[in-house]
Amino acid sequence: MLKSIVHEIIGAPRRTLDFPQSLQQFRGRKRVLIIFADAQDDRPLIQHQWLRKAHMRLIEEDVEVFSIAGGGAFALFDEDWELDADDIRERLQGPPPGEFGLILIGRDGLVKMRSHEPRHAEDIFKALEMLPRKALWQ
């Protein structure tokens, strides 16, 4: 968070993130929404409820949703994927264990949105509207 504040105030360049190896399978094909759901409050539950209500739209927008909790990564909806939760948390500079976070990743592998609070599906869809519909490279 401090890095983000410094970047906003003085324009210091952000460190380029290494894309997590276990998310490479989505690069150029899908958008990925990661929910860090270890928080000991109701934020993960609220976020999951909001996303479940928007399930069909998430499918239409080619968004895979994963929840990271307890050292594991789990698909919020149907498919099971082999993901390395610790690598994702580290490389995407996710919140520390025990904290809530949300990260939206575009098809290009770049982080498009971060939040430490649950976001309504419409907020996520607005962020998606700013992204290309199809991958520019494969």
Label each PLM-derived region with a short phrase.
Residues 1-138:
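Non-catalytic interaction/Regulatory regions outside core domains
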